[in-house]
Regions:
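Secretory/exported precursors with cleavable N-terminal leaders
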Residues: 1-327
């Protein structure tokens, strides 16, 4: 059984096989966990089940645990926001403040949504929406920001322009950074090769893991197969092997230097994964308001990453719009 993260990535990949994907499943998990506090009945059941939890308490505890774990080194910064035009149920506000450390403010227009996102991503994501329907009563927001240097930095003089094979087997010239004969944690099996790159963080709690299919012949097939087969067991197996002392190997590593952004509307993917009730007109959002008929209008995520010789800068912003059923 795959966790939410891997189920989500696989589903996303089936729809976008030709694209460079950049997503933060954790950002979605946190925003849905926060949102589930505003729901009841089937709406809540589907949301919690999608996240692989059994109860609302378990959902909140885990979201809280994830945030604390990621933020402990001050390398990752996580922010949650509730922008609202209505006065939400007291219990929902309390949960938002206590478990999610949410910033609560008035929802004025789309500019104040974009400003929140821009502030929390250090200006890297300047806007997440172009407009906001007047029927949107509340916007939930999550932002994750990460910046760290490599423990072993790449020498800028060893960055070369080289041919790189795209997924459709076409070639293009890209900047490839190079580490020659460095001792790195390296693992391979019949299907894949994986290498772990450490950031300059005291307890080594955050690393980058690059995974490549072994076969270079049928690149598109190999990459899609690799994603298709990726689940908790395989991933933990890779990580476990990379963490062994015995995995330290002298490696010549070429790593593309790249800057990438990616945005996606998550409505369809989440429906396909079993969370459909929240998007329907008869969704149960009594946890936010017992008087108003509310449902989710859309869930968006926008991501940015910059990988260079010095390190990595990455951020993610997720936006969830709760709308009033208008007759």
């Amino acid at each position: 059984e795959s966790s939410f993260e891997f189920k989500f990535i696989k589903q996303l990949n089936t729809k976008n096989k030709e694209k460079n994907l950049l997503v933060s499943p954790i950002g979605i998990e946190i925003i849905l966990s926060l949102c589930s506090n505003g729901t009841e009945g089937l709406t809540q059941k589907e949301m919690i089940k999608l996240l692989k939890y059994n109860t609302l308490d378990e959902t909140n505890d885990n979201a809280n645990k994830i945030m604390n774990e990621l933020e402990k080194n001050n390398i990752v910064k996580i922010a949650n926001g509730i922008l609202t035009k209505i006065r939400p149920n007291e219990k929902f506000v309390r949960k938002g403040l206590n478990d999610y450390k949410s910033h609560i403010d008035e929802l004025k227009n789309y500019n104040n949504v974009n400003k929140w996102v821009m502030d929390k991503t250090n200006g890297k994501i300047k806007k997440i929406i172009d407009k906001l329907s007047p029927d949107v009563m509340m916007v939930l927001l999550n932002a994750i920001y990460f910046e760290a240097f490599w423990k072993k930095q790449f020498d800028i003089n060893h960055t070369y322009i080289k041919e790189f094979y795209n997924i459709d087997n076409s070639k293009e010239n890209v900047e490839l950074m190079f580490l020659r004969g460095e001792k790195l944690n390296y693992y391979e099996n019949d299907d894949l090769k994986a290498v772990k790159l450490d950031y300059n963080i005291q307890d080594n709690s955050i690393n980058a893991i690059a995974i490549l299919p072994k076969s270079e012949q049928y690149l598109e097939q190999s990459i899609n197969d690799l994603i298709e087969n990726l689940d908790d067991n395989l991933f933990y197996n890779i990580v476990e092997n990379l963490n062994k002392e015995s995995s330290i190997t002298k490696v010549n590593l070429y790593l593309p230097k790249y800057e990438l952004d990616f945005e996606i509307n998550l409505n369809e993917i989440l429906k396909e994964l079993g969370m459909s009730k929240a998007f329907e007109r008869d969704a149960e959002f009594q946890g936010i308001s017992s008087k108003l008929k509310l449902f989710i209008n859309k869930i968006l995520q926008k991501n940015y990453i910059n990988v260079n010789e010095k390190g990595t800068q990455a951020c993610s912003a997720s936006e969830l719009e709760i709308m009033l059923e208008s007759y």
